[in-house]
Amino acid sequence: MSASLEPTPEQIEALAARPADQSVVMINLLQFRADRGRQSYLRYMQEVTPHLQRVGGTVRYAGESPAVVLGAGEKPWWDVIIVVEYPSPAAFLDMVTNEEYVKVHEHRAGGLDRGDLVATSIWTGAE
């Protein structure tokens, strides 16, 4: 399995150090494996739903990236972007460390060549 599909201990520590009373919005940039990667990831999406519900997570957006409108003009490396909001960093960590979730995660890891996950917060400057 690619190292980019699993967080480092330092990345987990950085997420856990975020404010506990603020939601965290995860930006998933996903590149599927050529052989049945999309199907494996779709199975993950179906099976992860109860785990998301248990911790209060919500999928806010899922979309494909067919073209760049502004920028270098090349097609992005990722196939799909999925945005998921969690009520807190602890909620996300609770989900991904759950024994039952770990079984479901196999479909995610098995379906991806690359899967970058960026933790973001609401930008108060935009309000």
Where are these regions (language model features)?
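Short S/T/G/P-rich N-terminal loop/turn motif that feeds into the first structured element of a domain
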Residues: 1-80, 87-94, 121-127
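Short, Lys/Arg-rich amphipathic alpha-helical interaction segments
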Residues: 83, 90-127
